[in-house]
Amino acid sequence: MKYKGMTCSSGSPAFTHLVANEDSFVAERLRRAGAVCMGSTNTPPMMASGMHRGLYGRAESPYNPEYLTAAFSSGSSNGSATSTAASFAAFGIGSETVSSGRSPASNNALVAYTGSRDVISPRGVWPLYPTCDVIVPQTRTVDDMLQVLDILAVKDPREQENFWAAQKHIRIEPVERPDSFPDLSLDSEDSLRGKRLAVPKMFIGGHDPQAKPTFVSEDVIGLWKTARETLEACGATVIETDFPLVSRYEDDSQSGHANNVQGFQPDWNGKERGELVAYLWDDFLKANGDPNYPDLASADGSQMFPRPSDYIPDRYMEQKNFMDYPGLVERARKRQGESIWEIEGIADALPALEAQRKRDLEDWMANLGVDGVVFPANGDVGRADLEQNDASAQHALQNGVKYSNGNRALRHMGVPTVSTTMGFLDGKDMPCNLTFAAGHGRDWQLLRFARAFEMATGRRRKPPVTPDLPTDGIEVKLTEGKGVRQGYSPPKLRLMEPHLDGRTLRLSGTAGLSGDGADVEISVFVDGKSTVAERDDFAWSVVTDFERFVPAKPLYGGYSVHVGKVNVVVIARGEGGVAAQHLSISPEA
């Protein structure tokens, strides 16, 4: 996702130093609303899987590091979800092509929203499969989600850069925006009363002869039974059903492909994963205008998604889903100016996707007389050691575990969903979400359903790996007994060159108001720990020991540029405001 001036590598070594020329639609809206971007988060290369290691590695679970923080095959927004769960930020913004937003939200006890077509513009976000791609806000509560959507769910004035808004092959019914998203919470506790909800048997350990086998652990079945009781206590009727939206889509006996969409031209699946991706990546790079990465044809395809040979998880992944990255570069070289709208088959594909959702979801719901579909977000969680443990890899790559439930069908056909915490798995201390889904345009009803369930349960809990710290609280204060005074300027804060001697760190600097430091309060934090600063008029100094963190060497990929460094934050408070500086110091310096 582009944030002007920051790198936007999409987790790929092929684009390490790619710098965004402007804000994405999402970043633009959030910045205008006063939000502060804390940073970009981890994703696998090109967002094309879940827990493969990208340029900066992968996120690890703040609930239980023995388990993955997202599904292995589709959970690319794992960094966004993990940082939000751990309260690094108030909320996160992910994206999803299969289950890349829903999956890490479930493994991190977060609310996830995947909207109907064109509710949140994806402009400025690296595309993967634009027919599937959707922006996924991730929050700790439904109320937080409503606040975020109040900012993001608006029309993009540059809609020609938004795939579904720009296409001319089928009319997408607009989703009417409520006057106020926060007002959707009003009386939402009763929103499930009198509603009929369908739960697909395949996702709760039942039998659906039309569906592919789906793994569901006893822990998840137990959580579902409790969730069902809660839904019924809220006044809903729950019926067990089939789920043709998924089972028909995944019937590869007809298409021979990973999906079966009636109306696709025979070779469309190859073009959707070939020319369409290549041309969109090419367009993205050209529009960004970084001279070091002018277009896709100049990229190194072999470095887009590198991983070791004989990589254990690859033994159990669907080979038909692997992308030919050097082949995409070659397609861009041979493009000869062809537009994505000139790719043969696209005019049939888009109406076919909309028609299949209407038939297999919306008409099916109408025939059953149900108001929504509800199901556990996943059948189990994968173990973190699957790169070294064959049994862990086999388990993590089963249907029901490798993706969020619903797999690619939900995204390919633009099904809106809202997920919220269902509870925690016994013995694993890992969360699992409950997902609400419905037809196009039913988004706001789903948000109310999720809030009613959340209010009735309150099952989310804080992650134990990142507990509350005294420094987590943001105290609004200046110098003792004083507020910001009119006509006063913030302190002038200066840091000198730090010195490291073994495990001892020496810092010094100055802070003052017009040369006088008497009225300035200095706070120094070394790796999050408060450290006492010695004062001498406007000069200050710190001498402290630190514990050097040496990260484990990953099997492949990298890790954050700040990992293994000493991080220092210095804050100066005066009568005219606050000044702060941050240092990231290498122990070898």
Task: Map each language-model feature to its residues.
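Structural helix-boundary/capping segments
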Residues: 28, 32, 86-206, 213, ...
